[in-house]
Amino acid sequence: MLRDGNEGMSTIPGSSQIQFEGFCKFIDQGLAEELHKFPKMEDTDQEMEFQLFVETYQLVEPLIKERDAVYESLTYSSELYVSAGLIWRAGRDMRKQTVFIGNIPLMNSLGTSLVNGIYRIVVNQILQSPGIYYRSELDHNGISVYTGTIISDWGGRSELEIDRKARIWARVSRKQKISILVPSSAMGSNLRDILDNVCYPEIFLSFPNDKEKKKIGSKENAVLEFYQQFACVGGDPVFSESLCKELQKKFFQQRCELGRIGRRNMNQRLNLDIPQNSTFLLPRDVLAAADHLIGMKFGMGTLDDLNHLKNKRIRSVADLLQDQFGLALVRLENVVRGTICGAIRHKLIPTPHNLVTSTPLTTTYESFFGLHPLSQVLDRTNPLTQIVHGRKWSYLGPGGLTGRTASFRIRDIHPSHYGRICPIDTSEGINVGLIGSLAIHARIGDWGSIESPFYEISERLKEEQMVYLSPRRDEYYMVAAGNSLALNRGIQEEQVVPARYRQEFLTIAWEQIHLRSIYPFQYFSIGASLIPFIEHNDANRALMSSNMQRQAVPLSHSEKCIVGTGLERQAALDSGGSAIAEHEGKITYTDTEKIVLSGNGDTISIPLVMYQRSNKNTCMHQKPQVHRGKCVKKGQILADGAAIIGGELALGKNILVAYMPWEGYNSEDAVLISERLVYGDIYTSFHIRKYEIQTHVTSQGPERITNEIPHLEAHLLRNLDKNGIVMLGSWVETGDILVGKLTPQTAKESSYAPEDRLLRAILGIQVSTAKETCLKLPIGGRGRVIDVRWIQKKRGSSSNPETIRVYISQKREIKVGDKVAGRHGNKGIISKILPRQDMPYLQDGTPVDMVFNPLGIPSRMNVGQMFECSIGLAGNLLNRHYRIIPFDERYEQEASRKLVFPELYKASKQTANPWVFEPEYPGKSRIFDGRTGDPFEQPVIIGKSYMMKLIHQVDDKIHGRSSGHYALVTQQPLRGRAKHGGQRVGEMEVWALEGFGVAHISQEMLTYKSDHIRARQEVLGTTIIGGTIPNPDGAPESFRLLVRELRSLALELNHFLVSEKSFQINRKEA
C-alpha cells in the first residue's frame, strides 16, 4: 500500500495482490522448504545413496505464450530442475546430474493460473487456527463443565475436561475419556515430573486410585493403557516396539502436530516459552493446559470465542500449493525407492535421470487444479467478477465446514470482521455466511491472519503512521470509525466520536482514541463499495446487488454511470481488462489488433484482445483509445476492455425510468421497457459460443474430416470448405453442419433386414462403410462463425486426438424474458416491449425507457434507488457526474437529501424546466400517458438510473419439446434443456388440471405424452393415416414399474380396467 504524505490518504491495494503475493511466497519459500524435507535414500544393502541438492533448483521460463496456451488447451507452466546425486559407497564415487522434477503451473499478475486452457483460481479457506481453546457447557444437571480443546495443524481434536469433582480427563477423537495422567505418562513423563511441573499438584494426586496408579507406574503400562483406549483394542495387548511405533505414527505425529502457527498460539495462550521449531505437542503443553483448565474451574482466566478472527487462520494459495508439492515429493520418494530396489535386483547401474520421473509432480498439480474444491474455474462474466473472485474466502472445503452442518453463529457477522471481512458480500442460499469476500484493504499476514490497516494517533509523532494490525492486536486499542476523516485536528479535539473497543462500539472523547480508520470503504468489499447510497438500503438488498453486479453482461456500447462511488476506475484497472502503457513513449502504430509503443530506445508491440470468449460465453474485446503520434505516460490506458469506458468500469446504461403501475405489466417485479432499447442497441450484447469435435482412431480405422457426407442434403453442407470445416464469416442456423466427419464401421449385409437388402439390390445402393458423425449446430446456436481452430496432435503421439473448435458469435438484443437489475437489489424480468409512442412521456415530450413497480420499494427497503435516479436526472441535465462516498450522514443529518434536492433545483433553473423540481412534491413530476395524451392522476418519481442486463437471458432458458428421447426404465421424457427433455407434470399440476375439470388433457399428459408406450405408437399411426385417436388401453409404464418394485418386496398388486359393462357383469355374478 502506498501512502501520500501530503494528504494523509493511501491508495487502494491491487485486488489480485493477495493471490499473486501468495504464489510468490510459495516460489520463494515453500519450494525450498519442501525440497529440504526430501530425505536421503539408501538401498537395502546400503551400497548406494540418492539425494537432492536443493540449493541449485531452477524454474525455466515457459516456451509457449499464455494466449496460445488458451487456444491449444495447454497448461501455462514452468519446468522445475534440481541437481541430484547418486553415491556409491564402495568406491566413494558420486554421479551428479540435473534432473527434471515436473511442471508447476504459473500464476499471472491477475492471480489466475492457466490449466488445460482454462483459467482457474484458488479460493482462500478459513479454518480454525491450531492451538487450545477453552469453553464452558452445562451438563444435564445444569452445572458448568469446562473443557479445553487442542486442535492440531491438520484439524484433529483432543479434549481436556474437568468435572464437578475437579478430576481432569482426556478425550481423544471424542472417544472414551481417560485420566490426564495416562497420556502424560505415555508421552514420557513420570508421576514425579508431572507433579513438579504443575501449579496444582494436590488436584493431580487426589483422584488416581491404586489401579490407576499401577497404569501409570511405568511408561510401558501407560503406553499400553493409552493404546488400548485410543485404538479401542480389547484383551490384554503386550508392549512392543511395533506398538510404540504405531502409536507414535497414528497419534503423536498426526494428531499432535501443532505446526508453526499452532506452536505460536499455544505459547501465547498458556504463557510458554517453547521454541518455535518444536511443532509437536509436548508433555509440558498438556500439563500447562490442565493447569489453565483448573484455573478456569475456579474463576481465573477467560473463555475463548471460537468465531473471533484471532482464532481463525487463512489457508492461502501458498499453503495449498506447498501442501500439494510436499505430497508430490512423497510420491516421488516412493517411486525412487522402488526404482532403486528394481535396479539392484536386476543388477543394473542406475543414474539420477533414470531414478527421477516427472509424473508425480505433474499429475499431482493437474489433479489439484482440476478436482480440489477450492480450485475453481475463474468467473469472467465481466471485469468486476474476475477481481471479486480472487478475493473470495470460504469456510467450505477439505478440513472445513459443510453447508448443512454449519451453525447460524458461524455464519453471522462478528465485531472482529471490521475492516477484514465484508459484512454485506456473501452467497445466497445454503452457503450464506460460509462464502464471502475480503474487505477492500484487508491482506493476509505471515501467520495466516487477516490484517487491516489503521492510522496510529500519537502526540509524539508529527504525522500519523499507518500500521497493519491482526485481530489479536487491535482488540486492545480504541479504534475510531471512518467519520473522523472529515474533521480537522482542531475540531477533532472537541469531538466525541464513535469507537470500537474489545468487540464493543462506544462513544468516547477524541483524546482517548489510539487508532482511526484510513478509508470510508475500509469495511466493505469491492462489490459492495460500488453501490452508491448503500446506507439507505436494507442489507439483504445490498447483498443481492453486490452479487448481481457480477452477473452483468458487457454491452456493445457501455456507458459510465452518472452516480458512482469513485472506485470504478480502480476496479477497471485491477481487472486487467485494459491495455496499460508499460513506460513513457510515443505511439507509432495502432489498429484493432495491436498498439506499437516506442520510448527509452525500445519498441514494444502490445497485442489487443479481439473477440475472445470468456467461460460464461461473454465477449472480451479491447478498443484502442490512443492515436498514432500521441505521447503517453507510464500507466496510461491505451485500450479499453469489455465493460470499461475511459478507464472506468461501465456495466450498464443510464436510462430514464419512472416508478408507476402500468396496466399490470409491471406487477411482481416485472419491468416494462420501450422499443428504443431494442432498436437503438442500448442493451445489445455479443456472446461467443464454442463447439468442438475430436477425431479418434477406432478399431476399424481413423475417423475422417471431409465435406463429402453421403445421404445429407446439400443445403446443410453449404458452409463447408474443401476440408470439411465451416468457413469463416458464414452465417449458420440450427442443424447446419459445422464439421463434416465420417467414422468407419463394418459393412455386413446380414445386419440389414431382408426387405432393406432387396431395395438396395434393386436401386443399386452400395453398403455404406462409414457412419456420419458430424458436428451439428444445436438449438439456439445460430450466429456468425468468427474463428476456427484446428489443433493438430503432436508428433509421435497417437493417444492425443485432433481437435477442431468452432467459435460462433451471437448478437442479442434485449427481449421479453431477459433479466435486468439496478445497483440496489431492484431486479426484474422484461414483461412487455412497448412502442415509443405508447410509453409515458415527460413534460418536454421525452418518452420513458423503463417503468418499475413502485410497490417494490417500501417492502424491500432499498430507498437508495430513489436518491440515485433523482440525482441522476440532475446530472444528465447538467452534464455532470457524481462520485458519492457511502454513509454521508456522518457529516450531517439528511445529507443525502440535502445533496439531491439542490442539484435538482439547479438543473431546473439552468434548463428552464420547472417540472424538474417542483416544491410541492420534490423529486416527482407529472407525466402523460403516451396512448391518450392525458396526464396521470398522481405525480410520479422519474430519473436516470444505472441499469444492467444480467447473464440470465431468455435465449439460454426457453425450451420446447415436440418429440425426443425417453428414459429406459420409466419410459418418461428426459429432464433438462440440454437433453431436449420434457416438462414434468407432477402432483400439483395434476391437481390444477383436475380443478378445472379438463379430464382429456389430464389423460393426455399422463399417457400419450408421457409413458404409455402403446398409446404413443397409436397416436403416431393415427396422425399419419388420419382418424380418431383411440383411448389408451392398459396401465402406463411407470405404474408397471411400481408393480415390479412391489413384487421385489413380495407384494402382489393386480390391476384391471373397470368399465360400465364389466361392472354390470360383476354385479350379476354377485
From Swiss-Prot:
Domain of life: Eukaryota
InterPro entries in UniProt: DNA-dir_RNA_pol_bsu_ext_1_sf, DNA-dir_RNA_pol_su2, DNA-dir_RNAP_su2_dom, DNA-dir_RNAP_su2_hyb_sf, RNA_pol_bsu_bac, RNA_pol_bsu_CS, RNA_pol_Rpb2_2, RNA_pol_Rpb2_2_sf
PROSITE patterns: RNA_POL_BETA (PS01166)
EC number: 2.7.7.6
A GO molecular-function annotation: DNA-directed RNA polymerase activity
UniProt keyword list: Chloroplast, DNA-directed RNA polymerase, Nucleotidyltransferase, Plastid, Transcription, Transferase
Major enzyme class: transferase
Cell location: Plastid, Chloroplast
Biological process annotations from GO: DNA-templated transcription
Catalysed transformations (reactions): RNA(n) + a ribonucleoside 5'-triphosphate = RNA(n+1) + diphosphate
SUPFAM superfamilies tied to this protein: beta and beta-prime subunits of DNA dependent RNA-polymerase
Gene3D superfamilies: 2.40.50.100, 2.40.50.150, 3.90.1100.10, DNA-directed RNA polymerase, beta subunit, external 1 domain, DNA-directed RNA polymerase, subunit 2, domain 6, RNA polymerase alpha subunit dimerisation domain, RNA polymerase Rpb2, domain 2
Gene Ontology terms: cellular component: chloroplast; DNA-directed RNA polymerase complex; mitochondrion
PANTHER family: DNA-DIRECTED RNA POLYMERASE I SUBUNIT 2 (PTHR20856)
Assembly with partners or alone: In plastids the minimal PEP RNA polymerase catalytic core is composed of four subunits: alpha, beta, beta', and beta''. When a (nuclear-encoded) sigma factor is associated with the core the holoenzyme is formed, which can initiate transcription.
Cross-referenced HAMAP family: RNApol_bact_RpoB
The protein's role, per its UniProt record: DNA-dependent RNA polymerase catalyzes the transcription of DNA into RNA using the four ribonucleoside triphosphates as substrates.
UniProt record similarity statement: Belongs to the RNA polymerase beta chain family.
UniProt name for this protein: DNA-directed RNA polymerase subunit beta
Organism: Illicium oligandrum
